[in-house]
Amino acid sequence: MTKVITTINEMQSIVKQHQREGKTIGFVPTMGALHDGHLTMMKQSVSENDLTVISIFVNPLQFGPNEDFDAYPRQLDDDVAAVKKLQVDYVFHPSVDEMYPEELGIHLKVGHLAQVLEGAQRPGHFEGVVTVVNKLFNIVQPDYAYFGKKDAQQLAIVEKMVKDFNLPVHVIGIDIVREKDGLAKSSRNIYLTSEERKEAKHLYQSLRLAKNLYEAGERDSNEIIGQIAAYLNKNISGHIDDLGIYSYPNLIQQSKIHGRIFISLAVKFSKARLIDNIIIGDDYID
């Protein structure tokens, strides 16, 4: 039976009890408004661990002053009903005051990995992410933590944090879950108008175009980016907010493609900014 926990003390007490019993703990951090991408991660955690904890916490530290913190969808009852069907053991749902009872005196700073892509567009965003993930890791103390590859930059940063701080957590990246037409599942898709939703399938189609160019031998980043942009400008009303090709997971911008690379795309529609990506290269598996 799924139980909702709202305090840090109770969550830590539960974790300690299960650790004493030698149980493995899987953890899926979320901000709620759960979709199939989240549920896929939870299913994997349930199948691989004795105990699964998810968090539902809309973290104010990762929202900028002009972003959608107050408008971010909150649907706790629906989310809890969904995870109960998956036999998730605990939902950790703290308040903002519970997580941040006073102003932080210690701040984590992310280097180069937060200065490109989403980090360049959203200053301070990834500092907020690593702060809350670090706190959640300390509270839940998972053996395995599951993150979606749709937020590939976030995944790279969390993996780097775990490595740099010797955290005893195995980070598992889960493949992007998509709608039938290819649109990546996202809590922000609900902001799309009906016409924008029809157009949004072209984000993934543009990335497939890039993959086809790569497989045909194209290695010039500018050529691939140019063709992606031309395709999108022809097929969507949204604005291309960011488009680039980077090494992965080091996120160094590439002019000539070699090794494993990450093509990142962000498109801003009227009320939604959608991101998508594709990873290709020497060890790429579709």
Swiss-Prot record:
Residues annotated for beta-alanine binding in this entry: Q62
Question: What InterPro entries does UniProt report for this protein, alphabetically?
Answer: Pantoate_ligase, Pantoate_ligase_C, Rossmann-like_a/b/a_fold
| Entry keyword Disulfide bond | no
Disulfide connectivity?
A: none
Localization per Swiss-Prot or TrEMBL: Cytoplasm
Catalysed reactions, as listed in the record: (R)-pantoate + beta-alanine + ATP = (R)-pantothenate + AMP + diphosphate + H(+)
Q: Write out the entry's keywords from A to Z.
A: ATP-binding, Cytoplasm, Ligase, Nucleotide-binding, Pantothenate biosynthesis
Catalytic residues in the record? H38 (proton donor)
Similarity comment: Belongs to the pantothenate synthetase family.
Can you name this protein? Pantothenate synthetase
The organism's lineage? Answer: Bacteria, Bacillati, Bacillota, Bacilli, Bacillales
